[in-house]
Amino acid sequence: MPANAAAPLYAKERYEFNKLQKRLRRLTGQAIADYGMIQEGDRVMVCLSGGKDSFTLLDILLKLRINAPVNFDLVAVNLDQKQPGFPADVLPNYLSEQGIPFHIIEQDTYSVVKSIIPEGKTTCGLCSRLRRGLLYRYAADHGITKIALGHHRDDILETFFLNLFYGGTLKAMPPKLLSDDRRHIVIRPLAYCKEEDIARYARIRAFPIIPCNLCGSQENLQRQAMKAMLKDWEKRHPGRVETVFTALQNVAPSQLADSRLFDFAALDSLRNTAETTPEHGAGLDILSR
């Protein structure tokens, strides 16, 4: 049996895995439909880092494509940043065995980052920007219409609270994004999926996971704190994390305080006019009780 082959499952384990697989496919398909992520004829580039999230994303998209209502192509793209100890043969071997079209971009961003960032400081920010630029360039040069990333529900929530607590903004990671230069569409098909489900799926499927800390940099401590906070919430108040994520899909600008999103100055002119929609009027009746 190959080193990365999935171990055989017993009946109960197989039943549980099938439920997990169906849930991930359903949630991924729902996110794709809700946000119009993939259209007929798209060339979708799955950014494969070698981590559990991107492996799961690629695997789920390959299976969804079989019965998808639209035709689209998939290509896996990995960026070999020349980090010391990076096992350069792992992804090509796996993708070749699976018959998946792929391309490896070889670019020594590791040396660039190390020459700029002081020792002991996190390199993730600069590394991410360099990586994004290289992937965007590849997409532009090869007719890629959608760039698929493996961010999941927990990533989105962690980012939301990072921006809330440390940035003073109400924003997260959108499931679908137009790049600043308006040339690329980035999609996150796993937006509805829990990290724990993805981790379990990747473990059972025995993907050849590549460690994400080869560069020696540690994940941002603030993000680690957000992850721990969400985990604690879910432990003490089951369902709270899902409720917070649902809130990101039910925004009421009239109940916040951003005058760029809602014209508060115009409310005087609306007095004694026809009743507003629930979004604009919800909560206002409390003031008159």
Curated annotation (Swiss-Prot):
A motif (PP-loop motif) lies at residues 49-54. It catalyses: cytidine(32) in tRNA + S-sulfanyl-L-cysteinyl-[cysteine desulfurase] + AH2 + ATP = 2-thiocytidine(32) in tRNA + L-cysteinyl-[cysteine desulfurase] + A + AMP + diphosphate + H(+). One of its GO terms (biological process) is tRNA thio-modification. InterPro entries: Rossmann-like_a/b/a_fold, TilS/TtcA_N, tRNA_Cyd_32_2_STrfase, tRNA_thiolation_TtcA_Ctu1. [4Fe-4S] cluster binds at C124, C127, C215. It comes from the Bacteria. It is found in: Cytoplasm. Its cofactor is Mg(2+); [4Fe-4S] cluster. Keywords: 4Fe-4S, ATP-binding, Cytoplasm, Iron, Iron-sulfur, Magnesium, Metal-binding, Nucleotide-binding, RNA-binding, Transferase, tRNA processing, tRNA-binding. Binds 1 [4Fe-4S] cluster per subunit. The cluster is chelated by three Cys residues, the fourth Fe has a free coordination site that may bind a sulfur atom transferred from the persulfide of IscS. GO terms for cellular component: cytoplasm. GO terms for molecular function: 4 iron, 4 sulfur cluster binding; ATP binding; magnesium ion binding; sulfurtransferase activity; tRNA binding. It is an enzyme of class 2 (transferase). This is tRNA-cytidine(32) 2-sulfurtransferase. It comes from Methylococcus capsulatus (strain ATCC 33009 / NCIMB 11132 / Bath). The gene is ttcA.
